[in-house]
Curated annotation (Swiss-Prot):
Classification via Pfam families: K_trans, K_trans_C
Reaction catalyzed: K(+)(in) + H(+)(in) = K(+)(out) + H(+)(out)
Keywords per UniProt: Cell inner membrane, Cell membrane, Ion transport, Membrane, Potassium, Potassium transport, Symport, Transmembrane, Transmembrane helix, Transport
Function: Transport of potassium into the cell. Likely operates as a K(+):H(+) symporter.
Protein name: Probable potassium transport system protein Kup 1
Domain of life assignment: Bacteria
Taxonomic classification: Bacteria, Pseudomonadati, Pseudomonadota, Alphaproteobacteria, Hyphomicrobiales
Disulfide bonds: none
Transmembrane segments: 20-40, 64-84, 110-130, 148-168, 176-196, 224-244, 256-276, 290-310, 348-368, 377-397, 405-425, 430-450
Stated family: Belongs to the HAK/KUP transporter (TC 2.A.72) family.
Subcellular location: Cell inner membrane
Membrane topology: Multi-pass membrane protein
Protein's gene: kup1
Gene Ontology, cellular component aspect: plasma membrane
Amino acid sequence: MSDALSTPQVALPAQRPTPFLTLSLGSIGVVYGDIGTSPLYALKESLNAATAGNALTEAMVLGVMSLMLWTLVIIVTLKYVLLIMRADNHGEGGTLTLMALLQHVMHRRFAAISLLGMAGAALFYGDAIITPAISVLSAVEGLKLVAPVFDPYILPLSMAILIGLFVVQFRGTAAVAAWFGPIMLLWFTVMALGGIMNLITDLSVLRAINPLYGVDFLMHHGRAGLLALGAVFLTVTGAEALYADMGHFSRRPIQFAWFAVVFPALALCYLGQGAMLMSHPERLENPFFFLFPEWALLPMVGLATAATIIASQAVISGAYSLTQQAIQLGLLPRMEIRRTSETEKGQIYIPRANWLLLIAVLYLVFAFKSSSALASAYGIAVTGTMVITSVMAYFVMRKCWKWSVATSALIIAPFLTVDLIFLMANMLKIFEGGWIPLVIGGGLMGVMITWRRGTKIVAKKTVRDEVDLGDFIKSISVSSSISRVRGVAVFLTGNPNSTPTSLMHNLKHNKVLHEKNVILRVVTEDVPRVPEAERSSVEVVNDLFSRIELRFGYMESPNVPKALAACADRGFSFDIMSTSFFLSRRVIRPAVPSEMPRWQSLLFANMAKWADDASLYFRIPTGRAVEVGMQINV
């Protein structure tokens, strides 16, 4: 509970916590969308890889089914639901959250942890691009079973659905999000019923619960077995979302939803598909939709399309959230971030990220044309992210939880081994499309490394030319040659002990000083959100100058005017109409010689050029902002 709720002078209505079951239902609609739509294609692709063009056998079905069930148990249930979700940063999860959590305890090794965090984030974007494409395609492909005449329209219809999904993102999801949970609950219920109807016709498929069937399959199928194992991983491609979206619903509701609804429904659906294929191997073309009677095909295609849109929405929202975190942590340049809800903190829209995602998703749909072809590109990015999560979780156990080396290694080693086996299996698909998420991830990793390195060089060069603030205030306070003007001037700076460049330029060119001057520093903390009671600190230096520090979490969008207005109880009176904000706008030019390679300095210069203005990012009204330009060679 926030400190604001316990402050006696503020009369607020009592706020009841969101009911546990409501949170669980919400998590079914958001967190489990990706993993919940995997039955549309996972078993089909796994068995196609296992057969390698040969006839489907009972041993193949039982072996692959066993691998799928135990993958759900080991990776999702044991690793994520019961272990990894304990490694939260004030309720938030994800690789960048782990990076922030380790920042103050790793010290000398933090550079390596930063690289791991950036790699995990970059690979997530590869997943965010593939998930909408493969999910929507696999749902719409069900129309072929309704009537073959629909076949030519599957690709354009899928692209139309995806375009519509991305175009309406600016409206936010507040109006329809309440339906996500009930629709996905219906999806899991119908999916489980379809599985049960087929499972009762051949209960012998329950033998797949024995893990020895999976081991035997891998031992006797060589390369085809490894390819099938890579496809089996499609059953858990949404597992990382459980951890990344933890902040929206908290750990226990997500865990309850998994054990009460999602896991039983997935297991029953996969077992039902397996039972059906043991009797009707010819239905491998699309085993999910064959679970249902012919009269139910069209409604199921409609429900599947709705479920895949919801799953895609969850991944898109996750990409926005990750982009915001990366910006706040200094890994990406500033971009416009719009809030789409007045009440829900996590609902944001980032236009630039949205359109880049849409272009990439449409390219994948157009290039691969079917969910089966696209499945070869799926999995590598997620397995890479899971390996990184396991490694970082080990350091959390050691450094944050203070567990011994032996205990930490004993717990993480089995999970890391499984992750590495799946990574190796998925590496076999590199030349069939698996290179795409790796190229996307590698490119984004290069962008983040370049931006972080470039901003450090800029900061170092800026500090070198700055004047100590204490000395400056002493000299300017006794100077009689500087004119005073009415109002308040706020000078943004990254170093509160140095005189802001914008202040020096204002004095040099305008020869004036405001009657009240604020040296403002905006800090991003290593926590998701900063309580309002800890948002600001005010230090009055003398009659002319004050220092203010505003603190925001890496999940927050900084609103500087609003935060300054809240400083009234700390003795700072703020009126936006009598305040001018002075910001330094740095023009980056590639230097020769440079501290970075030529390509990197050119990339950094272009990224800086396309970064959003600080006034927009900090929500400073355009009419109150004064930008002072300066050139820096990097």
